Regions:
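Mature catalytic core of soluble alpha/beta enzymes
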Residues: 1-246
Length: 246
C-alpha cells in the first residue's frame, strides 16, 4: 500500500487506488456496460482521491465513503509474490510468467542463455500477428495498459476501462496503449496506467523517477520508445512507424 500511495502522489493522482466505485458504475467488463449520467459520476467523484487514504504502519484509515481498489495493480502484485517465492525454489533456474496477457514476469535465465522475449499485441488488430517483441531480463517485469482490453462501443465511440480520476471518464488523449518495463511488478502495472492517463509528454518525469522504460502506441500507428526501450524493442508490423520520444 505504501508503494501504491507513493505512486499515486508521484503521478499527481493520474494513478488513483480509490477509483473503484466509479469503475463499477461504468461496468465496462460486466453485464451492463453503459455511459453513466453526469450526476452519477459527480456523486461518486467527491469520494475519490488518494489523499483520502492514511497509512500508519500496518493501519489503513479511509475517509468516509472512500473505498480502496487494488485492481489496477493486482496482477503486478501477483508477479511480485511469485518472484519472491521462486527465490527459494532452487530447482527453478528460469521461467517466464504471463498473467492475463498484460502483466509478465521473467525469472532467472533460459537454458540457452538467450534473452526472454515478450510479444506485444497490436491494439487495433488483437487477433492477428503481434505488433512486436520486447526483450526483458530475469528480475524484470512488463505491463501493458491499453484501450483495447476492456471496452464497449456506443455511437461510434470507444469507452474503455482506463478512467481519468479527475473526470471519471475514459482517457481520450490519442494513445492506444502504453507498455512499461521495470524491476517491480506492482510498479510496472501502476506506471502503465498512470502513463496512459498522463499522456506521453507528461509521463516522462514519472518514468525517469522510477527508472522505467516505456513504449507508447498512438492512434496514428506511431510507436514512441524511450531510450531504454529502443534497445529492447523489435518491430514485427510494417504498418507502424517507430519514433524516439522527444
Amino acid at each position: 500500500l505504501a508503494q501504491i500511495e507513493q505512486l499515486a502522489d508521484d503521478s499527481g493522482g493520474a494513478f488513483d487506488p480509490t477509483l473503484g466505485k466509479v469503475i463499477r458504475l461504468w461496468d465496462i467488463d460486466g453485464e451492463d456496460p453503459h455511459v453513466p449520467e453526469q450526476s452519477e459520476l459527480e456523486a461518486l467523484l467527491k469520494d475519490v482521491g488518494y489523499q483520502n487514504v492514511t497509512l500508519d504502519g500496518n493501519k489503513v484509515t479511509l475517509a468516509e465513503d472512500t473505498t480502496l481498489d487494488l485492481g489496477a495493480t493486482g496482477k503486478g502484485i501477483g508477479c511480485d509474490v511469485i518472484s519472491e517465492f521462486l527465490k527459494d525454489q532452487k530447482e527453478v533456474e528460469g521461467m517466464i510468467l504471463n498473467l492475463g496477457g498484460s502483466s509478465v514476469m521473467a525469472y532467472g535465465q533460459k537454458p540457452d542463455d538467450s534473452p526472454w522475449k515478450v510479444a506485444v499485441t497490436d491494439p487495433r488488430d488483437t487477433e492477428s500477428d503481434y505488433l512486436g517483441a520486447i526483450t526483458i531480463k530475469g528480475g524484470e517485469f512488463l505491463s501493458t495498459s491499453g484501450d483495447y482490453e476492456k471496452y464497449f462501443m456506443e455511437d461510434g465511440k470507444r469507452y474503455h476501462h482506463i478512467l481519468d480520476p479527475k473526470t471519471g471518464y475514459p482517457v481520450w488523449n490519442g494513445l492506444d496503449s502504453v507498455t512499461i518495463v521495470c524491476d517491480n511488478g506492482l510498479l510496472a502495472d501502476g506506471l502503465s496506467t498512470a502513463c496512459f492517463v498522463l499522456g506521453m509528454d507528461d509521463a516522462m518525469e514519472l518514468l525517469e523517477k522510477y527508472d522505467a522504460d516505456a513504449m507508447f502506441v498512438d492512434e496514428d500507428k506511431n510507436i514512441y520508445l524511450t531510450d531504454g526501450m529502443k534497445e529492447r524493442f523489435e518491430l514485427m508490423k510494417n504498418t507502424y512507424t517507430v519514433k524516439a520520444v522527444q
